[in-house]
């Protein structure tokens, strides 16, 4: 029998807390993601956050499950990075922002990056992303399958 031993995180690093600029997508365009179960799942593109991290200019799109702005409270950004499959979960990680339907500055704290539910159970269906940051995101939740939870 397996027992829950807690969740593993990389050490906190304040340099992974950055301010970016959110630009909403007025069309809330449909984005179809392939999932961990081989099906497709529709999300709605709520906008993009542009930011600089470790000297790299990056953009992270954010998505919601609703296309009704009155019902959207937050958005999820899906990403992979240089540690994906090497200490970070192989299908990528997520980060959330509060939703406002206007351009504004927003803080992205990658220390809060988390694994999708499918990292812990094969019964969950999770969207997969091909967005790759060529920057090792050495903060946030680690791969729960990594025996040593080691980023090396």
Description of each model-found segment:
Residues 19-21, 52-54, 61-63, 80, ...:
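A structural detector for beta-sheet-dominated domains
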Residues 35-90:
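Mid-length scaffold segments of soluble, non-membrane domains
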Residues 76-116:
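Acidic, glycine-rich flexible loop segments
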Residues 105-107, 111-152:
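Extended, aromatic/histidine-rich regions of cofactor-dependent oxidoreductases associated
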